[in-house]
Swiss-Prot record:
Homotrimer. GO terms for cellular component: membrane. It comes from the Bacteria. HAMAP family: LpxD. Keywords: Acyltransferase, Lipid A biosynthesis, Lipid biosynthesis, Lipid metabolism, Repeat, Transferase. Catalyzes the N-acylation of UDP-3-O-acylglucosamine using 3-hydroxyacyl-ACP as the acyl donor. Is involved in the biosynthesis of lipid A, a phosphorylated glycolipid that anchors the lipopolysaccharide to the outer membrane of the cell. This is UDP-3-O-acylglucosamine N-acyltransferase. It holds the Pfam family Hexapep. One of its GO terms (molecular function) is N-acyltransferase activity. The lineage of its organism: Bacteria, Pseudomonadati, Pseudomonadota, Gammaproteobacteria, Pasteurellales. GO terms for biological process: lipid A biosynthetic process. Belongs to the transferase hexapeptide repeat family. LpxD subfamily.
């Protein structure tokens, strides 16, 4: 049965100032341009203010500055930051199906596993010996958790997550389907053309309140651990190589590749499809915009970019030709400078 939420109930959750009918109810959340009378919506960018006056939404989350752009009949939740308020209410109204409770009959649980209270383990999951699962842990269907791994209270693994041996995952983490944690790092020695594999015997250690998207790979350390600190969020399809260390509060967008032994500071923002060299350090509070190619350490906070923005093919070919010829242009310029001087 669809649950309903009143204006006053939602205001209480986010400490909002209310304007309108406190008894009006909504059932879910929709985009500003599509929301109907039974739906909540929000505005987080001033360029969408033109949509406010004609919005059919049952309730709008707005800032004080947005109010004058709304219809007098609109029911409003007035807050300092509408996007943060939306995030909080989205959690409160979340309709994502809950995992099945209890332990499925087809789950394989080895001897010597320690289970906390209210642990749920889905169909065909495999939990090897020595694993410790904290209270309220949820292991989805077809997951694999290797020997001596520890998973903290309240953490959820969606279906088909693979966690290798000796991994530590903190409390209240969320790991999406297809992710692999603790696979071998890319460690080899070359003996006259023959690759000799170096066993990767380090760990992966993940802090509390970490979220990892689908189909991301986090390799175990060669000797020491690969470390993901508290409150890090990592999107889909990322490659985190062995012995990478990601600091607290950093966000990593989709498709990012981090080479081995890279240290990323706290509260960094790494744009999608960026590639970052290894064996170096990025300081705290660095933003790397999408498709950044980072080959050297970054020692000062700030916003960094690389790459060529999209052009028509004709324009891009001209740009590429100029780039390839820049060394010759530089030599001619220096020759002219010598003549003038």
């Amino acid at each position: 049965m669809q649950k309903s939420y009143s204006l006053q109930e939602l205001a209480t959750q986010i400490g909002a100032t209310v304007r309108g009918n406190t008894d009006v109810v909504v059932e879910n959340i929709a985009p500003l341009d599509k929301a109907q009378s039974n739906q909540l919506t929000f505005i987080s960018n001033v360029k969408f203010r033109v949509l406010l006056k004609d919005s059919k939404a049952g309730i709008l989350i707005v800032s004080e500055e947005d109010v004058e752009h709304c219809s007098p009949e609109s029911n409003l939740l007035i807050v300092k930051d509408p996007y943060v308020a939306y995030a909080i209410l989205a959690q409160y109204m979340d309709s994502t199906p809950k995992a099945a409770q209890g332990i499925a009959k087809s789950a394989v649980i080895f001897d010597g596993v320690l289970l906390g209270e209210n642990v749920s383990i889905g169909a065909n999951a495999v939990i090897e010996e020595g694993v410790v699962l904290g209270d309220n842990v949820i292991i989805g269907a077809n997951c694999f958790v290797g020997k001596n791994t520890k998973i903290g209270s309240g953490t959820q693994l969606w279906a088909n997550v693979t966690v290798y041996h000796n991994v530590e995952i903190g409390a209240n983490c969320l790991i999406q389907s297809g992710t692999v944690i603790g696979s071998d790092g890319f460690g080899y020695a070359n003996d006259r053309g023959r690759w000799i594999k170096i066993p990767q015997v380090g760990q992966v250690i993940i802090g509390n309140n970490v979220e990892i998207g689908a189909n991301t790979c986090i390799d175990r350390g060669a000797l020491d651990a690969t470390i993901i600190e508290d409150n890090v969020i990592i999107d889909n399809l990322c490659q985190i190589a062995h012995n990478v260390h990601i600091g607290t509060g950093t966000a990593v967008a989709g498709g990012v590749i981090m080479a081995g032994s890279l240290t990323v500071g706290r509260y960094c923002l790494i744009g999608g499809a960026s590639v970052i060299n290894g064996h170096m350090e990025i300081c705290d509070k660095v933003t790397i915009t999408g498709m950044g190619m980072v080959m050297r350490p970054i020692t000062e906070p700030g916003v960094y970019s690389s790459g060529i923005p999209l052009q028509t093919n004709k324009e891009w070919r001209k740009t590429a030709a100029l780039t390839l010829g820049i060394d010759g242009i530089n030599k001619r310029l220096k020759a002219l400078e010598k003549k003038i001087s």
